[in-house]
Amino acid sequence: MIKPLSYLNVADNSGARELMCIRALGGSYRESANIGDVIIAVVKDALPNMPVKRSDIVRAVIVRTRKGIRRENGMAIRFDDNAAVIINKEGNPRGTRVFGPIARELRDKNFTKIVSLAPEVL
């Protein structure tokens, strides 16, 4: 569960290292976001000489949360960190690699490009 002012790691090679959530998209009174949801975030830490700079406002899709999710078959899955992948307006990732495992729910939400780049899908 990611709320405004929550910090997330970046799970791609776009140049950003850490994001801070500003807003969860999908409704005027939406308070939190979970795996597969799109957020608006600000880059708090970034690598030098990369396309994404510090203090840039970006869109990102959440790929891992510590709270986790419960699947319809009764299985619960949670991760060790909160992480997101930076995307563009069309929903494609800005980086060319994705690090760490991601949840299968991203495939259901039509983020197939991120799923294909991921080394492990849980």
Swiss-Prot record:
One of the record's GO cellular component terms: chloroplast
Main location: plastid
GO biological process, one term: translation
Transmembrane segments: none
SMART domains on file: Ribosomal_L14
Pfam families: Ribosomal_L14 (PF00238)
Subcellular location: Plastid, Chloroplast
Matching CDD domains: Ribosomal_uL14 (cd00337)
Keywords: Chloroplast, Plastid, Ribonucleoprotein, Ribosomal protein, RNA-binding, rRNA-binding
PROSITE patterns linked: RIBOSOMAL_L14
UniProt GO MF annotations: large ribosomal subunit rRNA binding; structural constituent of ribosome
Gene3D superfamilies noted in UniProt: Ribosomal protein L14 (2.40.150.20)
The family this protein is said to belong to: Belongs to the universal ribosomal protein uL14 family.
Protein role: Binds to 23S rRNA.
Subunit structure, as described in the record: Part of the 50S ribosomal subunit.
Name this polypeptide is given: Large ribosomal subunit protein uL14c
Species per Swiss-Prot/TrEMBL record: Chlamydomonas reinhardtii (Chlamydomonas smithii)
